[in-house]
Amino acid sequence: LLRAAEVADQVHAECVWSRALTHEQLAPYLTEESAEVIEAIEAGSADELREELGDVLWQVLLNAAVAESFTIDDVASDLAAKMIHRHPHVFAGETAETPERVIELWNAAKSEEKRSRTSVLDGVPKGMPALALAQKMLGKGEQVGVGLSYVEEIRAVEVIEAEDDEELLPASEEDLGETLLGLVALARARGWDAERALRGRIRALADEIRSAE
C-alpha cells in the first residue's frame, strides 16, 4: 500500500498530464471505476474484483496526491479514527450481540460526529443514482416518521386498482426488477423521463421530511 502511494505521488509529480489534473476532472473516473467494481461483484469474478478495487484505490491515491491541504496519510488516519469510534463494541466497552445493535451503535456514533447537521438529510449525496437515492431518502424519512409504502405509491398513480394489492406486489428482487423495468418502459412509451420523474418525487419527499423535523 505504501508503494502504491509512492507511485501515485511520483506520477503526479512527473507526469505532465497527471500534474495538471484537478479533483473535478478526476471525479468522473472515480464514478466509472466504482461502477466497474460493482460489475465485477455482480459477475462473481475474484480476479476482476481485485483489479477493479485496485483501480478505485488508484483514484483515492491520485486525489490525495492532487490535494494541497492533506496527504494520503491524513486520509488513512482520519478513516482509522472514524472506524474505531463507530465500532465501540470492537474497540471499547460496548456490547453488540446482533447486527441490529451494531447499526444502533454506528448511527449513534455517526450522529455524535455530525452534531452540526440540522437535518437527517444533511450529508446525503444528491448525485446518487435516482433509485439508490430514493431508497436512502425513504430510510431517512423513517427516522422522522415520514413513511411511504410501495402500495400507497402505486395507488397514487392508479397503476393498481384491485382491493387486495398485496398479492400483486413483487415477491422477490427479480420480480421487483421486472416491475421497475416495466415502469421505465411505460415512461419511455409515454415520452416521460423516468430518472427526472423519480428525482422530482424525491425532492417532494425531502420537503416532507424537512417539514416533519
Task: Please identify what each model-predicted range represents.
Residues 1-52, 58-213:
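Flexible "arm" and connector segments at domain edges
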